[in-house]
Structure formats: C-alpha cells, structure tokens
C-alpha cells in the first residue's frame, strides 16, 4: 500500500506512482 496519508510519499518514481494511485483510489 502507499504511504501518502502522512503527506510524505515514498522517494523515487515509486512514490510518484504511489501518490498517483492514492489520488485515484483515495482510500481514507
């Protein structure tokens, strides 16, 4: 799962994709 809830996505392109998925899914 992504770690965007903290507002600090993983570093690198992985974080970029993670952030995109989080934005698309938005699982709060």
From Swiss-Prot:
State the organism named in the record: Bombus pensylvanicus (American bumblebee)
Tissue expression from the record: Expressed by the venom gland.
Q: What is this protein called?
A: Mast cell degranulating peptide
- Which keywords accompany this UniProt record? Disulfide bond, Mast cell degranulation, Secreted
Instruction: Quote the function comment for this protein.
Output: Mast cell degranulating peptide.
Per UniProt, subcellular location reads as: Secreted
Gene Ontology cellular component annotations, sorted alphabetically:
extracellular region
Disulfide pairings: 2-18, 4-22
